[in-house]
Amino acid sequence: MSVLKKPDLTDPVLLEKLAQNMGHNYYGEPAWPNDLLYTFPVVILGTLACVVGLAVLDPAMVGEPANPFATPLEILPEWYLYPAFQILRVVPNKLLGILLQTAIPLGLMLVPFIENINKFQNPFRRPIAMAVFLFGTLVTLWMGVAATLPIDKFFTLGLF
């Protein structure tokens, strides 16, 4: 037989907390099973219904339709592959381009070992990791934009 501690309902501190609904959600129901089994599926299915409904009723054109009788001047990959495409396009040796793309994740795996700081610390107090992140983001965006331009405008992005 388990022994449960009964709350002292004459304690003024406890009565003040109960008056402010502390320890309970606003409508007084527990999160399990009510929220997790009933509310979340309704929200998820409602969101899914909205997305599917919009996709069926108002489809967005992703680009111009393909013409099997005309080859485009320059064939580009999908937008998320632009930086990798730009590396292969700029580096003269294709093997060197593949090795460069392999070296990027390997270099990122070394960053935590370079900076010997508590992993639970604020990310803004890790200057090396923040510098690597910001530099990598800028270079990736730069290469992604440059992949859509001619090769002679790669470094300046056509601005100068």
From Swiss-Prot:
Membrane topology of the entry: Multi-pass membrane protein
MF-aspect GO terms: electron transporter, transferring electrons within cytochrome b6/f complex of photosystem II activity; electron transporter, transferring electrons within the cyclic electron transport pathway of photosynthesis activity; oxidoreductase activity
| Keyword terms | Electron transport, Membrane, Photosynthesis, Thylakoid, Transmembrane, Transmembrane helix, Transport
Q: Which residues cross the membrane?
A: 36-56, 95-115, 127-147
Pfam families reported for this sequence: Cytochrom_B_C
Q: Main site of residence?
A: membrane
Where does the record place it?
A: Cellular thylakoid membrane
Q: Which GO terms describe its cellular component?
A: plasma membrane-derived thylakoid membrane
Q: Which domain of life is it from?
A: Bacteria
Q: Which GO terms describe its biological process?
A: photosynthetic electron transport chain
| Cited InterPro entries | Cyt_b/b6_C, Cyt_b/b6_C_sf, Cyt_b6/f_cplx_suIV, Cytochrome_b_C_euk/bac
Q: What exactly does this protein do? A: Component of the cytochrome b6-f complex, which mediates electron transfer between photosystem II (PSII) and photosystem I (PSI), cyclic electron flow around PSI, and state transitions.
Family according to the record: Belongs to the cytochrome b family. PetD subfamily.
Q: How does it assemble?
A: The 4 large subunits of the cytochrome b6-f complex are cytochrome b6, subunit IV (17 kDa polypeptide, PetD), cytochrome f and the Rieske protein, while the 4 small subunits are PetG, PetL, PetM and PetN. The complex functions as a dimer.
Name assigned to this protein: Cytochrome b6-f complex subunit 4
Tell me which species this is from: Prochlorothrix hollandica
